Amino acid sequence: MRTAIVYASVHHGNTEKLVKRIAEECQVDLIDAVKQPDADLSSYDMIGFASGIYFLKFHQSILEFVEKNLPDDKKIFLICTYGGSANYKTIEQILDKRHASVVGKFGCKGYDTFGPFKLVGGIAKDHPNEEDMKNATDFVKGLH
């Protein structure tokens, strides 16, 4: 099954760290939504979207990528890193319009220094850690 993960990793590289580990251990292609905003996904059987959570949603580049590039009727999985909590609502609304089937979701803590967290040196400083990366890799392996 040909699989890609489209990701955005902006502030601390949490999401990129996670998806690069997944790519090392699983047969997936990585697509940076910021650097490759027009990537063609038509040849993939399953597509993952991965992002940190920004203002309770996936990064804007991911949301725009889905709107613009996702072929209808694809199997989708979602991965997020977060300081506060996971939130899939906005991206799931967009995916629903594209008749995509969400086959799984994975989230883990990620180092966060946004807003008031900066005053205390950030939260989730050691995340994603080895356990988070193993869990993410196991999650993707379990989808195949």
Residue ranges and their predicted role:
Residues 3-6, 10, 16, 21-29, ...:
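FMN-binding flavodoxin-like domain, especially the glycine-rich phosphate-binding loop
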Residues 27-38:
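A short beta-strand-loop structural module common to alpha/beta enzyme folds
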